[in-house]
Amino acid sequence: MDVKSRASRSSRVKGLTEIVPTYWEDAVIPTRWKQGKSHMRDHAYIPLIAGLDIETSTAPDQSCAWMYLWCMAIDDFIVYGRTLRDLKCWINRLINVLDLRVDYKLLCYIHNAKYDLSFLRKTVSLSGRRAGEFIARTQRQIIKCCMDHCIEIRDSAVYSEMPLEMMGIDINMPKLSEDHDLIRTPETPLSDDDLRYCARDAHILTEYYHRQADIYGGIDALSDIPLTATARVRKRLDYCFRSQRGTMDYVALTKFIAYRQLHTKHTGKNAPTEEQLKKYERDRAVMAMLRSAFFGGYCFASPSHAGDVYKDICVSADIDAAYAWAMLTQRFPLDRFEPMPVPEDDAEELEMRNGLGKWYNHALLIHVRLHGLEARESELGFLPSWLRYSLRYDTLKRNKSGKRVQSAEMLELCLTDVDYRNLYTFYTVKEVEILDVVGSRYGYLPAYITDTIMMLYSEKAAEKTEIKRKRREHTATLQDEIRYQVKKTMLARLYGVFVQDPIRMHWEYNDETHHVESKGLEQADTAQYGHVLYQWGVWVAAWARDRLLGAIIDLGAPEDADGYPTWDGSVIYADTDCVRFLLHGEDDPRIEMLYAQNEETQIEMLEIVRTRKRQFEAIYGIPIPDDLLDKCGSWDIERYAVYKHIGIKQYCTVDYDGTFKATIAGLPKADYREDDNGETTNVGMSYFDQFETIEDKVEAMQVGMMIPEEESCILRSVYFDELHELDVVDCTGELRHVSTDCGLVLQPAPYKNRKSDVELLAGMLEEDVVGEITKLGIDFYKVAKAAGVHQGDVSDLSERIKEYSYDLELMEILKKH
């Protein structure tokens, strides 16, 4: 966007910040709206962007909620209504006046569509008539749909990954204030301030996405605006890929994509041959093995150290951009997986484990059955106990933390060659059966992956330099901080592109039942996700995990005479890219070891940049310094004045400047620090406000701690689908009648430190049920999440599992128990 258009938009926004919306019946739709179309494939959008926001009130007993106001902003034109019928009439009017059709839509954003659409779904149609017009992540989370087939709704939250307040600050349109505790109904008189509040929220959406449209080609290219935050990074990958047109990387991957697009339903000239069908079916089996072999970052919190306070001896070492480091420096399976020899004896098995002989220079997927599995150290398990990796097992026991496999009489699973080697590092096995092995040629990732990482790093570095300058000059604003965080998360989202699950649930909206219904699992057989293969994501996670496990051994598990780690108790916490350990003294040699590793990593990164720099600058026209990736993969070392953990992702720290920080998974972080005036301020949850001293705050972090609902910031979603009619006294003191038949109530819930929701779920089911679920290749975490399990809420669990289950076979299993 040029300077002139940016300035004109800023002045226009400044003049509209205090507007009062027009009642929908009095609104005159501008005739200029009907001019022009935006084309993309077979879709067309009117060159406008709309934003829709609703305001709701909750019944005193929290049994139901209702909408009392809606506002729709279309560019600088804002209207409002009071009822769902008003909204339906306004939508019909827009469709008729603008001549909206299935192929000529209005693009409309809703922030947190999961909430708003729960109130609208019985009033308007949400189904799509074409493929891709309805997209949902779960049965309740719709991220894209077509309202009455002509207004395309997109969830703003999954794109921006920011609260609406932050979006407003980013475009210099801060949200207004409103008392949400007051009860209002559609008949309650509203002040101009009430109307402005809702109008501002809708207006923020239109202005924010106008600026995003400018990034992706302007108002005439609305289809180019990505749907999600991950898709934004995918766009960057796609750009770098197409910039490599004509290179060997480009030709090789396009051929691979063309092969993956083969589908059994093709007929006539496009019908696949018998040999192609055999390869296709084999690839489907390999995809199942890949999904089974994938699991995320390694997490470890020593149970024997839980609740202990460590002063001035705890050091945290964090890997900067661990996943990007793996993509740049490690090798990956570059082509199709083919059958490989199965080891016939122990000597061949050892060769395969070390990547020698017949298996040299091949990335391997190994289907293995282990008998008599036992962890070498009770606290340091390696295999997670709740993932879909487990195909079959017998008498499986978990370690003290409940997160890792301690032992198993029999365990059948699929592993990458990287994880297979680590298996023997952390476990003893009485008998090993190798059932199947497939392999792919090892090699480094294509140049466009490196280019994407360097481009994202360059943008992040520019923002970082600017924010540091402003911080020194004390001119940094919250808007500057937000923009820096956006650039940081873009780099983190690159990993999300690599590990996007190729098999997902297909959801459709039923306009008769007003529910999202499962239509079974569907497999993405094309490499359409930003020209990244799923197998690369499996190995990215494996390499990052391998480095973390290696660091744990180096820092806290020295090898015994046989070369196996013996945990000395000094490593007390680890999570994905972070290791925390206790010092052995002021001159602990492990600190120097980490700095030495940093020097080696920096030399490696310097060579990567220098090798690619000339071509990168010639292709993209972006100058980059030699030390662009200087920090990538290096250890960021920090020593704490005080450290304490009570479980995985549950810990508190005190810095040497007196800053107290507390992290509890699922809750906003607490961050207590002194401002420029010497006063202590907090960003995050308020639970620790009641404790005056730092020592008291640290002491309050306890195993089994309970945080009241008014301080936990946890909101439990409770949906209702039945008709509620009630009389309530509104904020004006008048008795009003309210009728509502669908919606969502956000009920505050307390936090209790205890076993995870997944462990709760598994504890309520018999072991054979868990085994049957894992046989289906279904991620047990996703089952628990889909079941709607919340802290302190396991009522009617089995019924909710059936309602939100990901697979019809899963429903049948649960019905039997």
Question: Model features per residue range: what roles?
Answer:
Residues 53-61:
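Ser/Thr-glycine-rich phosphate-binding loops at phosphate-binding pockets of nucleotides
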Residues 810-814:
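Hydrophobic micro-packing sites on short alpha-helices
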